[in-house]
């Protein structure tokens, strides 16, 4: 049995932000959400998040995850933070996994290894360590040949010889809670910062073993925007390598970004300068980009998208989107549709084989199958107070520069003459002309007296 505690009380002053550090986004998820994601496969019995700075904002940002929150009203160090758990874990006899809310790149496999080593060896504590190329600023961990920790020395207290040791404390621990609970009340703040350090407890609980993480990048903490950008680069490399190995083609990967919440099927091709975000799913054979943004959208097989923005929308097999189209607000595009340049769809549903080829806005509309929307067709959906729907039947064709003033319904097989403004419903099989008659006055200029 394991309980997880996540330290998320710090202010993060080096971020220079009003937003709590742990809520800063990294590839579509906040830093602390990524930490929470990494422990979910461990099936912890409880997930406790220790909050302090802007506690209510952090709670609100995580409320959908059904966590337990423990407040550290004054931030007096990591040991003090874990002391706040004492009344919440009274009588608990299992293990406590302690993580930092600003270390978002940890893999679940690493935590599984830490927990397995801890439980197999019946350690009082097991700590995660790593060998850094440049360990400056990190506490050094000294072990015997069996990885039993002999000493942890803070960087500022290291002798020149001790600084040659590049094995550092990652600040991630697994404790036998009964042992730790006995030590926590006796921690002392005997340091310049007058803080209570969890490392002081580590040396007092009993046998402590160290486990090395293979990739030191996993334990990188985020303290400023530069480190946030570095973490994003690492995360993107992981995600893109995963998809390329799974049969997805990325043309110029360095110019492409993909959230790790995105799902792609084999034989998808992603062109340069394309960005895939949120809960996006793209099926096999689709070609996306160049220069496109797709967010929280589902695309079928063999869809093509060029230089377009698609959010919160669904596109069926074989549709062609762009260039320079904008789909949003739960747009639904049927199979083998064509959405051309400078077309915007908002909260609009199109049936199969419907074309909106260029220069049109369809908002709050429904169009059937094999509809052809002429260039410059607009649905006037807003009356200044509320929005209304437009309904267009199967095989209907609108001429160029038509305006459909909602609420209005066009039946099946309707022809709308170019330049018409439609304000009333049109029955099936009709030609509708709603424009003023052209008047030509020969010789008007001379008769008017204009020179």
From Swiss-Prot:
Compartments where located: Cytoplasm
Stretches the record annotates as Linker: 226-246
The family this protein is said to belong to: In the N-terminal section; belongs to the N-acetylglucosamine-1-phosphate uridyltransferase family.
Cofactor annotation remark: Binds 1 Mg(2+) ion per subunit.
GO CC annotation terms, alphabetical: carboxysome; cytoplasm; membrane
Subunit annotation: Homotrimer.
Pathway annotation: Nucleotide-sugar biosynthesis; UDP-N-acetyl-alpha-D-glucosamine biosynthesis; N-acetyl-alpha-D-glucosamine 1-phosphate from alpha-D-glucosamine 6-phosphate (route II): step 2/2; Nucleotide-sugar biosynthesis; UDP-N-acetyl-alpha-D-glucosamine biosynthesis; UDP-N-acetyl-alpha-D-glucosamine from N-acetyl-alpha-D-glucosamine 1-phosphate: step 1/1; Bacterial outer membrane biogenesis; LPS lipid A biosynthesis
Phylogenetic classification of the source organism: Bacteria, Bacillati, Cyanobacteriota, Cyanophyceae, Nostocales
Sequence intervals crossing the membrane: none
Catalyzed chemical reaction(s): alpha-D-glucosamine 1-phosphate + acetyl-CoA = N-acetyl-alpha-D-glucosamine 1-phosphate + CoA + H(+); N-acetyl-alpha-D-glucosamine 1-phosphate + UTP + H(+) = UDP-N-acetyl-alpha-D-glucosamine + diphosphate
List of residues binding acetyl-CoA: 375, 381-382, 400, 418, 435
Top-level EC class: transferase
Domain of life: Bacteria
One Pfam family in the UniProt entry: NTP_transf_3
UniProt-annotated binding residues for UDP-N-acetyl-alpha-D-glucosamine: 7-10, 21, 72, 77-78, 139, 154, 169, 223, 328, 346, 361, 372
Keyword Plastid included in the entry's annotation: no
Organism: Trichormus variabilis (strain ATCC 29413 / PCC 7937) (Anabaena variabilis)
One GO molecular-function entry: structural constituent of carboxysome shell
Residue numbers annotated as active site: 358
Entry cofactors: Mg(2+)
Record HAMAP family: GlmU (MF_01631)
Location of region: Pyrophosphorylase: 1-225
The gene coding this protein: glmU
Binding sites annotated in the UniProt record for Mg(2+): 102, 223
Name of protein: Bifunctional protein GlmU
Region (N-acetyltransferase): 247-451
A GO biological-process term: UDP-N-acetylglucosamine biosynthetic process
